[in-house]
Amino acid sequence: MHGAPSGKSNSDGTPIDVYTIVLNRLIQEQGCICAYCMCRIPEKGKKATIEHIDPQSATSEEKALDYRNMLAVCNGNRDAHNDKEKSCDAHRKNAPLSVNPLKSDTLSSLKYLSNGEITASDDAIKKDLCDTLNLNCSERRIPENRKAALTAY
């Protein structure tokens, strides 16, 4: 379905790319920020993808198409040959998550350390942040960028 036309067309006859429309809307709603690592997502280009909170492989088609199950995420260094260099959904693949950036209990569990690393008071969320999503990926300089943002305040 990624990038596939919907079967509908604009008034000039060009196909409507529903995937791109949804992705662009998610990016705008999230302020051009990746839902996981919080890096900037450029508004143009193939630098983002739609992430499903509940993986498509483990849910119904209806849930997979539910807008409330979707997030815009960066490419997570998807083309890296080594998994330790990947983050976000590129590192997650289809693993289930306890962390959900749309839920207040997830957000209240988050902690940022002075070295720029992210952790959580909830052990399951901490495992998702550090292991499943690899959000302290030094190869992508995620902690370093977080630390720079914290010291800029």
Annotate the PLM regions.
Residues H81, E85-Y112:
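A contiguous binding-surface segment within folded domains or other stable secondary-structure elements
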Residues A124-Y153:
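C-terminal, charged low-complexity interaction regions
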Residues N82-D89, G116-D128:
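Short, well-ordered strand-loop elements centered on a beta-strand within folded domains, enriched
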Residues C39-S87, R92-K93:
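Histidine-centered nuclease catalytic patch
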